[in-house]
Every structure is written in structure tokens, then in C-alpha cells.
Design a protein with these regions (language model features):
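Iron-sulfur-associated redox domains of electron-transfer enzymes in respiratory
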Residues: 1-153
Length: 153
């Protein structure tokens, strides 16, 4: 579904999302890097870059996470599954090539059996992409059948 969000409306949009309990993530300067990271306001958003130094995938695949805990009770093992691992979030400023990876991974994590961690995060996280106005030698959008201004992804 295509919608347009104008730069002048970022601040009120970010504030309203945060008021609704969404974690807001966007490209943000961190020393000499541009990282997708949580922001408090639209003034932290940096859009003058080709691609971020990290991918949206890290918000779907944390580096570490608790997948279960267990307790030994006499002759049996009690297993507890974690709750609240899928946080409502909006990621601004993803490039189409990065967002295009999600439907590909959907096929992997919903093939034979469904990965509930993946599914719940996919349902909880909304991606807002921005078209590219420049590229560098590491860009690969055309390699995956996209273009810098792709509507899919």
C-alpha cells in the first residue's frame, strides 16, 4: 500500500506514533556512521546518506534473545516461553532493497512450519521506505530486480 509522508510532517507523525506506544526507528548519525536506531524526535532523523550501516533485519533478528526458560521440578522440566518480544515499531528511512528482503525471508520462516518470533515481529513492525536519490558501488537493487525508486520493498 503506497502512502506519502512529507518531510514537514515528520515531527507530528513521529510524536503521534510515540503517543500510541510505537517505538520509532530511523537513520540517525552516530559519530561517522548512519545507523537505524530508536529516535525521540524527527530532528534526529538523518536522510543525507546512500544506505545505513545496519539493516532493518537486526530489528527482526536481535543479536541475542531469550527464546525459552526452564525450571527443573522433581522428575519433570517446566518450560516457559517469553512474552513481549514483538514490540510495536515503525522503521522510517529503509531503502527498498533492504525492505525487499522481508518477503523473501517470509517464505523461509513460513515454509514448512511457522516461526512465531518472526511472524509476531513482522506483524508488529511497519516499514516506511524512502527512494534513493544516489547510489554507491555497494548498491545491489538492480541485482534483485528493483530500482532506486522501487515501489515494492
Amino acid at each position: 500500500m503506497e502512502k506519502r509522508l512529507y518531510k514537514k510532517d515528520f515531527d507530528s507523525f513521529v510524536t503521534s506514533l510515540q503517543g500510541l506506544g510505537y517505538k520509532t526507528i530511523a537513520p540517525k548519525k552516530d559519530n561517522n556512521l548512519i545507523m537505524l536506531d530508536e529516535i525521540q524526535g524527527a530532528d534526529e532523523i538523518s536522510l543525507d546518506h546512500v544506505i545505513t550501516n545496519n539493516s532493518i533485519k537486526e530489528f527482526f533478528f536481535p543479536k541475542t534473545e531469550k527464546v525459552l526458560s526452564y525450571r527443573m521440578a522433581k522428575n519433570k522440566v517446566e518450560i516457559e516461553e517469553p512474552e513481549g518480544f514483538a514490540v510495536k515499531a515503525v522503521i522510517f528511512g529503509s531503502r527498498p532493497c533492504d525492505a525487499f528482503s522481508l518477503p523473501v525471508m517470509d517464505k523461509v520462516f513460513n515454509w514448512d512450519c511457522s516461526d512465531k518470533f518472526w511472524v509476531q515481529r513482522r506483524e508488529a513492525i511497519t516499514i516506511v521506505t524512502i527512494a534513493c536519490d544516489k547510489c554507491d558501488s555497494y548498491c545491489f537493487c538492480t541485482s534483485v530486480g528493483l530500482a532506486p525508486d522501487a515501489k515494492q520493498g
